[in-house]
């Protein structure tokens, strides 16, 4: 539903801390250490509580109102075939991996069981036949490393193990008592830190293995504080890989990547037929060392027939108040099921409160009691057993509302929505904050064994749109509109009859269907599966974690093969570095072809070419101390030093080479593949590989990260700046008249990884030829794999300023342009009203496509005239901005923030909340009133006939974008005088407000319709216009007819959109321009009818 409270994505992240190098001399303050200690203790307690909860006695749903007879056999998973664990292997695609604490199980070839609690990993997945699987993986214990202190030998191992185990047990008092030793083993081994090149090879490290994952944090903390070792005093131990999640640690060691296929060999696993812990069809136990992991290549790239469920709910709210689960009932829950790979949903189900008329193609199940309705849905979930659950804003509205409502009504068996028997789905609050998105509060609902893909959260994270309502995104990506029912109307439909409830159910089913369409169209599931495979993390991590865990996983895998360890780095310092180079643009309108040359994967290529990595970094002065020859290391443009690959090949360059070569193979396979499902997988894979390669550089420069390294990130951008400058110099020195070319080439602009070159030729074909030649020639001057490629030609080309340009793009065919490309202009920005984007786009189209600058000027003047004369529809004037912080947290007053506060006072339930985009228009007010005081809700403006501040829109919204476009064509001084002054700006229309101001103290008097003079009676005309009364009446009737015809057209269009030509239009979609037009015309009709009533009833002579 579009009225749901929308809040932003993501789990909470710690407050930002500044970045610093590994070798900073300053020690952290005691206060910072205490804060870190508190944070770790809280994390331990949360993990401990979660593990304890997992051990609660089963209470799963029993009975319920959704009987077996109500279930279509096609909804269920296929019946389980006989499986012999001794002769048949079990092969399945895992979707989610987590862990819990339980009792050990006797397994073939496994160690003897004990009464102590042990960590058990749990992999949920699906077989090729569609059977659901839960695999309990035993025998893997958490561990981390620390350098052995000087003088430490094998004789000290038992003493350290005893001291550390005692210290951890003492530290855990007050919590759950440990049933056995905290430290299982401490071993001596040879490893090397990945941070910096030391030249001495491996050194002694201690591998500390613990009983439970939650003991890693206290063990690390106690070791950092110092542990007594007989004969060595109380040395402090620096932790390595102690901040790695238990699941990631297991997947790295077992060589398992996200969503890959696992094989359990025959005779190595035990099938649980009794005492099952989950609702899965197949539940097995196996040793972690017996699990075979298949790399996602060839036949193992396929995706199992996953079952995807999309759902939506409707609530009956009170008038003007947003639904609250403590008071407002759930009246409908609609669900659609899809088997991945099939074209159509196999399941359409509407659960309704009170009888509902049948719906073609869907099963309708009605209930008289809300408690029965609520119990039926989890029972249906249990029967259908979905692998993936999707919807629109289910994370922040649907799921929390259902769970809270069931709790209010004491439907105790409702919140068992996951696959683990007896484990409740709980709600917890989460907060995410960053410079890019500000602060977003959200909720997280646990549903173990099922992957949640909230399409609103996906779109917020991956796409920048003006509006994120389901209607807006459906129109943007699918080209489809939908009926949008206001929450206050939903109650009226519910209280109507079977047909009105049917209409509500159809609306609800469509709201469940559209997220499925979006999931398929945007390839969200496929892309995330492939990203999980490429980066090696569980699928759930991609949806709830940040970017860094993806690089950490790849880094750990590569490091393990070479005996390298990742240190735990405390980020302290606060340095910054210079970003990429932008060559100063030569602004203007170019009516000649401009060739664009682009560095392919610039930052990854730089890191590979120059061997930039943690493992190759030299400390200041280290090159001399280690006796390195000048040809064995490089000095970067920023003064940092790294050894060359001949001395040591860096980890990051190896990771990048693997990613880019895998992408090349995936693209080659994609070009040959004909099967549409396989093409989707390959396309998702090559995209995941590209994104992963580009994110490695960002990982090294992250302010608060697992392993920040300023030396790498600043060196990369330093080389990038140097290469752009060198490319400019090479192009302009070769392509000259002296060297036999038609003209002297000129680089008109360069930005980060691309340069725009004017070769002085007149045809696109010649520019393409010279562009390819120049790309190959320049590439020969840079080390491999750095490569400059010809990308496209712009003709014509409008260069406005840095990061702002537009042109017709030719990439392959010199005779036909691909599209009109705009960067940084209001045509593609979302922080202006649609009028700006539409006017900029239409003006650019006239300039670039039609080659008619004069026509563009005339069109812009016409639009400005329409604006000043109040002929622009209000939907074109709506500005939307995101509410990223509370009002008190903004440094200055903001228009959308102030409006949100006013709307909260009018109606707290429907007011925008954090993470929402707030639509508003600027209305007219007294001179000197600040713009933030003039923001108002568009619907409120229409209902109360508030005047629009057209001068604001002309001066603050249209003026600068138009001048940016037309100044290169008309000249800086002339553009302003032609566009913003002149006859077209002299005629203005101002509406009279019906509320506020001095109108509260004035008495309204009628005016003559003919001459506008004040009259003292209720009639339509004065005595001087009386002879023309018939003529004036006919004129107003004609105006009324025109309004009625316009309203009928708009009404019919809305009826077609809602799918019924015989029902009232109740849609209130604020993202649809038709809605505002319909509201405006309806109001104009009412005013016109009142005006005609002033003429009085027709006299006898009219008959």
From Swiss-Prot:
Its main location: nucleus. It catalyses: DNA(n) + a 2'-deoxyribonucleoside 5'-triphosphate = DNA(n+1) + diphosphate. Zn(2+) binds at residues 1008, 1011, 1022, 1025. Residues 1-29 are annotated as: Disordered. Binds 1 [4Fe-4S] cluster. Its cofactor is [4Fe-4S] cluster. The keyword DNA-binding applies. [4Fe-4S] cluster binds at residues 1054, 1057, 1067, 1072. A motif (CysB motif) lies at residues 1054-1072. Keywords: 4Fe-4S, DNA damage, DNA excision, DNA repair, DNA replication, DNA-binding, DNA-directed DNA polymerase, Exonuclease, Hydrolase, Iron, Iron-sulfur, Isopeptide bond, Metal-binding, Methylation, Nuclease, Nucleotidyltransferase, Nucleus, Transferase, Ubl conjugation, Zinc, Zinc-finger. Belongs to the DNA polymerase type-B family. This is DNA polymerase delta catalytic subunit. The gene is POLD1.
């Amino acid at each position: 539903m579009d009225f749901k409270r929308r809040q932003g994505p993501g789990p909470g992240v710690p407050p930002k801390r500044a970045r610093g190098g590994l070798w900073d001399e300053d020690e952290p303050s005691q206060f910072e250490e205490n804060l870190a200690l508190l944070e770790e203790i809280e994390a331990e307690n949360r993990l401990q509580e979660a593990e304890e909860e997992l051990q609660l006695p089963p209470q799963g749903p029993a009975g319920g109102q959704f009987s077996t007879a109500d279930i279509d056999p096609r909804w269920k998973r296929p019946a389980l075939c006989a499986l012999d664990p001794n002769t048949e292997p079990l092969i399945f695609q895992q979707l989610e991996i987590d862990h819990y604490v339980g009792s050990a199980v006797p397994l073939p070839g496994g160690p003897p069981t004990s009464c102590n609690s042990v960590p058990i990993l749990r992999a949920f997945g699906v077989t090729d036949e569609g059977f659901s699987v839960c695999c309990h993986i035993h025998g893997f214990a958490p561990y981390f490393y620390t350098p052995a202190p000087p003088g430490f030998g094998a004789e000290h191992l038992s003493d350290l193990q005893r001291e550390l185990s005692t210290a951890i047990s003492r530290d855990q008092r007050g919590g759950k008592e440990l049933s056995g030793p905290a430290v299982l083993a401490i071993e001596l081994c040879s490893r090397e830190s990945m941070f910096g090149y030391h030249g001495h090879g491996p050194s002694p490290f201690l591998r500390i293995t613990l009983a439970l994952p939650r003991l890693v944090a206290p063990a690390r903390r106690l070791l950092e504080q110092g542990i007594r070792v007989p004969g060595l005093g109380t040395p402090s131990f620096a932790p390595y890989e102690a901040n790695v999640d238990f699941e990631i640690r297991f997947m790295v060691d077992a060589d398992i990547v996200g969503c890959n296929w696992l094989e359990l060999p025959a005779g190595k696993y035990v099938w649980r037929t009794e005492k099952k812990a989950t609702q899965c069809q197949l539940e097995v136990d196996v040793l972690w060392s017996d699990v075979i992991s298949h790399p996602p290549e060839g036949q193992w790239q396929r995706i199992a027939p996953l079952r995807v469920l999309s759902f939506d709910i409707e609530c009956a709210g009170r008038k003007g108040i947003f639904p609250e689960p403590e008071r407002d009932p759930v009246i409908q829950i609609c669900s659609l099921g899809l088997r991945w790979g099939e074209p159509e949903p196999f399941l359409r189900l509407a659960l309704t409160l009170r009888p509902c008329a049948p719906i073609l193609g869907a099963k309708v199940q009605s209930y008289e009691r809300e408690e029965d309705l609520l119990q039926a849905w989890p029972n249906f979930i249990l029967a259908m057993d979905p692998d993936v659950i999707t919807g629109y804003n289910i994370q922040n509205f649907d799921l929390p509302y259902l769970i809270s409502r069931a709790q209010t009504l004491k439907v105790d068996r409702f919140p068992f929505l996951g696959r683990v028997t007896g484990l409740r789905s709980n709600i917890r609050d989460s907060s995410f904050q960053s410079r890019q998105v500000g602060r977003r509060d959200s909720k997280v609902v646990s549903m173990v064994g099922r992957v949640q893909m909230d399409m609103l959260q996906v779109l917020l994270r991956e796409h920048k749109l003006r509006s994120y309502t389901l209607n807006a995104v459906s129109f943007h990506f699918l080209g489809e509109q939908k009926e949008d029912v206001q929450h206050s109307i939903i109650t009226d439909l519910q209280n109507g009859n079977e047909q009105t409830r049917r209409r509500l159910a159809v609306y609800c089913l469509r709201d469940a269907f559209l997220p499925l369409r979006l999931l398929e169209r945007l390839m969200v599931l496929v892309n995330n599966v492939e990203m999980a495979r490429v980066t090696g993390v569980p699928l759930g991590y991609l949806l709830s974690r940040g970017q860094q865990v993806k690089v950490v996983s790849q880094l750990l895998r590569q490091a393990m093969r070479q005996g390298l360890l990742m240190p735990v780095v405390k980020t302290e310092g606060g340095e910054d570095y210079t970003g990429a180079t932008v060559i100063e643009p030569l602004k203007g309108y170019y009516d000649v072809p401009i060739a664009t040359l682009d560095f392919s994967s610039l930052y990854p290529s730089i890191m590979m070419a120059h061997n930039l990595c943690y493992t190759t970094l030299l400390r200041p002065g280290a090159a001399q101390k280690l006796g390195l020859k000048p040809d064995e290391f490089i000095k970067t443009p920023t003064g940092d030093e790294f050894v060359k690959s001949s001395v040591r090949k860096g980890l990051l360059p190896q990771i990048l080479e693997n990613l880019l070569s895998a992408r090349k193979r995936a693209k080659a396979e994609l070009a040959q593949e004909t099967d549409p499902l396989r093409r989707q997988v390959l396309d998702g894979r090559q995209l995941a590989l590209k994104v992963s390669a580009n994110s490695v550089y960002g990982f090294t420069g992250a302010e608060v990260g697992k392993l920040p390294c300023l030396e790498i990130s600043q060196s990369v951008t330093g080389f990038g700046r140097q290469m752009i400058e060198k490319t400019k110099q090479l192009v302009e020195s070769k392509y000259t008249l002296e060297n036999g070319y038609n003209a002297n080439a000129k680089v008109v602009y360069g930005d980060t990884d691309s340069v725009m070159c004017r070769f002085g030729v007149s045809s696109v074909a010649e520019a393409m030829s010279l562009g390819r030649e120049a790309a190959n020639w320049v590439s020969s001057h840079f080390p491999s794999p750095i490569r400059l490629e010809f990308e496209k030609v712009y003709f014509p080309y409008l260069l406005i300023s840095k990061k702002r340009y537009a042109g017709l793009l030719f990439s392959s065919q010199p005779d036909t342009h691909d599209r009109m490309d705009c960067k940084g202009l209001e045509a593609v920005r979302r922080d202006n009203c649609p009028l700006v984007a539409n006017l900029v786009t239409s003006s650019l189209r006239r300039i670039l496509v039609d080659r008619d600058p004069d026509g563009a000027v005339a069109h812009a003047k016409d639009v400005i005239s329409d604006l000043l004369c109040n002929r622009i529809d209000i939907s074109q004037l709506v500005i939307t901005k995101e509410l990223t912080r509370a009002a008190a947290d903004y440094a200055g007053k903001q228009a959308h923030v102030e409006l949100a506060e006013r709307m909260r006072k009018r109606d707290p339930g429907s007011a925008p909340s954090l993470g929402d985009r707030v639509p508003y228009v600027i209305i007219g007010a007294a001179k000197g009133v600040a713009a933030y005081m003039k923001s108002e809700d568009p619907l409120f403006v229409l209902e109360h006939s508030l005047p629009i501040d057209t001068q604001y829109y002309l001066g603050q919204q249209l003026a600068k974008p138009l001048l940016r476009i037309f100044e290169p064509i008309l000249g800086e001084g002339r553009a302003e005088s032609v566009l913003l002054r002149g006859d077209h700006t002299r005629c203005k229309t101002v509406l009279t407000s019906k509320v506020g101001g001095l109108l509260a103290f004035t008495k309204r008097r009628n005016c003559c319709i003919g001459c506008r003079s004040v009259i003292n009676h209720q009639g339509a005309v004065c005595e001087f216009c009386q002879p023309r009364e018939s003529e004036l009446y006919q004129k107003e009737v004609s105006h009324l007819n025109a309004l009625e015809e316009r309203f009928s057209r708009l009404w019919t269009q809305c009826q077609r959109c809602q799918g019924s030509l015989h029902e009232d239009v109740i849609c209130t979609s604020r993202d649809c321009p038709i809605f505002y037009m319909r509201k405006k015309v309806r109001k104009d009709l009412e005013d016109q009818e009142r005006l005609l009533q002033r003429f009085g009833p027709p006299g006898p002579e009219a008959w």
